[in-house]
Amino acid sequence: MIRQVITSYFLTVCLLALVQGETVQDCENKLPTSLKSRLCEIRRYEIIEGPEMDKHIHCVMRALDFVYEDGRGDYHKLYDPLNIIELDKRHDVNLEKCIGECVQVPTSERAHVFYKCLLKSTTGRTFKKVFDLMELKQAGKVPQHQRYTAEFVQIMKDYDKALNC
């Protein structure tokens, strides 16, 4: 019985590792030439338009598990992290609004529309913190259980500096 439980657990962990897929770094490594020179702008959350940017943001938002495969924003993946960093009832409204906006555009543009909508909303500052924290966790720069603190600003600056940004 114990052997079956252990085997089942091991197989589940292996399956999750396979499903997890790409990281933000993987997405940045696949940037097309036209965007490679703009990586630092992208990392500063500057809005860049175009189909190549749509594809990149889709990749990054999927890597962080903030959107579904079809690019729709995942309310449940962002609501708690946003409110842990900053408790604000507007996060709920902004997530709903941005999900509503992204479902009205073609699938290829959804993740980018969701991303831009969140950045432009009153949730934007907190969304950037959640985004940075999740990226740092994914890159192994901070423990998975770690909450956002002021020191993450410097950790992220150091991480960006290592990328020549």
Curated annotation (Swiss-Prot):
Primary localisation category: secreted
Consequence when changing H56L: Increases serotonin and tryptamine binding. Reduces serotonin binding and increases tryptamine binding
Residues annotated to bind tryptamine: Y115, D132, E135
S-S pairs: C27-C59, C40-C165, C98-C117
Positions of noradrenaline binding: E28, R43, D132, E135
Signal peptide boundaries: 1-21
Organ and tissue specificity: Female saliva (at protein level). Female salivary gland. Not detected in female carcass without salivary glands. Not detected in male tissues.
Domain of life: Eukaryota
GO biological process: sensory perception of smell; vasodilation
UniProt subcellular location: Secreted
InterPro entries in the record: PBP/GOBP, PBP_GOBP_sf
Outcome after substituting D160L: Reduces serotonin binding and eliminates tryptamine binding
GO MF annotations, alphabetized: odorant binding
Entry keyword Disulfide bond: yes
Gene3D superfamilies in alphabetical order: Pheromone/general odorant binding protein domain
GO CC aspect terms: extracellular space
Family: Belongs to the PBP/GOBP family.
Role played: Modulates blood feeding of female mosquitoes on vertebrate species by binding and sequestering different mediators involved in the host response. Binds serotonin, noradrenaline, histamine and tryptamine. Inhibits histamine-, serotonin- and partially noradrenaline-induced smooth muscle contraction. Exhibits vasodilating activity.
Protein name: Short form salivary protein D7R4
Organism field: Anopheles gambiae (African malaria mosquito)
